[in-house]
């Protein structure tokens, strides 16, 4: 019989580009550690993910941009950071890549890792392909193995694709279950 200390360490590359991604990533990391104690997390994340053991390559705030104008104004810096991250992850040779939200940043990283290292890739939070840029699903098929969705209806957007889709739910729904309101009679 082998102990958990004898098992291979799994190196997970995980990247969140904004606060909401950090809030999704930390519980995921906690769950993964509880089920497999020999995990090393590398990538980019915020304080919650770092507290779960992430070795963050750079501060998440470096890539946290919103809207249309802010990314354009920071495009050169964002591309340089993404290139540096790709090099770091290639050298680290992770067993799997998990991109959390931020699809315009994470999907090119997943594509690079899929082509270079041929590792499994996961996108946690589906891009809004059900609303716009529906053609993106076809390009995602080339580099994303699994999408974890927050809403059950999102799975339909992938019905004609080879991407495995898993509905995991929205964390707000779970937190609402913790706080039940009193009945009107109380």
Tell me the role of every PLM-derived stretch.
Residues 117-178:
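Active-site-proximal region of nucleotide-activated glycan assembly enzymes
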Residues 49-51, 97-114:
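An aromatic- and histidine-rich active-site surface loop
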Residues 84-104, 124:
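Short N-terminal targeting/anchoring amphipathic segment
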């Amino acid at each position: 019989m082998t102990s958990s200390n004898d098992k291979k360490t799994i190196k997970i590359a995980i990247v969140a580009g904004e606060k909401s991604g950090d809030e999704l990533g930390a519980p995921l990391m906690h769950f993964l550690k509880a089920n497999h104690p020999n995990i090393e997390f590398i990538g980019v994340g915020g304080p919650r993910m770092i507290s779960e053991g992430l070795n963050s390559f750079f501060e998440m705030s470096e890539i946290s941009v919103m809207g249309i104008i802010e990314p354009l104004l920071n495009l050169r810096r964002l591309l340089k950071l993404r290139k540096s991250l790709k090099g770091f992850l290639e050298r680290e040779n992770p067993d799997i890549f998990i991109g959390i939200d931020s699809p315009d940043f994470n999907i090119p990283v997943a594509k690079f890792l899929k082509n270079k290292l041929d590792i499994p890739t996961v996108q946690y939070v589906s891009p809004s392909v059900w609303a716009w840029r529906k053609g993106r699903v076809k390009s995602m098929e080339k580099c994303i193995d699994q999408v974890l969705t927050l809403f059950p209806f999102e799975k339909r957007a992938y019905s004609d694709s080879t991407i495995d889709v898993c509905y995991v739910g929205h964390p707000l729904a779970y937190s609402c279950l913790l706080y039940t309101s009193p009945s009107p009679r109380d």
